[in-house]
Amino acid sequence: MSDFATARQKMVDGQVRTADVTDHRILDAMLALPREEFVPQSKRALAYLDLDLDVAEAGSAPRYLVKPVLTAKLLQAAEIGPGDSVLVVGCATGYAAAVAARLAGKVNAIEGDQVLAEKGREVFSRLGLQNVAIKVAEPAAGDSADAPYDVILLNGATEVVPERLCGQLREGGRLLGVLAATRPPRATIMTRSHGDIGHRTLFDASAPVLPGLERVPAFVF
């Protein structure tokens, strides 16, 4: 077993399983997908650690793969079915989208950094993932072209209720991510029902806030 394969097994056994992730499809996907492929060569030794990993080019604004356990727990809470359409927002190089692609019928992913989006496409091609695609778009915009979605997954946090993204959910659709407007921040699921959006807290969590989903500072005289 290679060093990366050993690290992958330890990540699943030591981080993901111990966080009450029991969906075998998610565990199998994380065991199968080489997370190091989504990480710059200089940071591959960090690929399986329990941290938010900046994968942006030097000199670019930070962009992250969130902690593996957060990805796993959000995907488990999403209850993605094999026929579901999924949108991953702020995907960076696409690891969360790749895991989701093992669960869903179709996955769209959006990323504002064109260089990272292209890297993600290259990794998807190398891994033979045919039901997932990355578009260059800002996180707050979503991807209305293929809406509505059964599930929208934020690869990060939001400080505001993402109304535009919620509008791209189908009836019964779920949006999941870290709501950083609360203290402490909490992983939250938002469900569309009869045109309204309901909120339910899942667990305490933290993640970097996605670009465009920051709270606008109030003007003070």
Per-segment meaning from a language model:
Residues M1-L87, Y95-A98, L103, L116-Q130, ...:
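Class I SAM-dependent transferase core
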Residues L75, E79-G198:
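Conserved nucleotide-cofactor-binding alpha/beta core module
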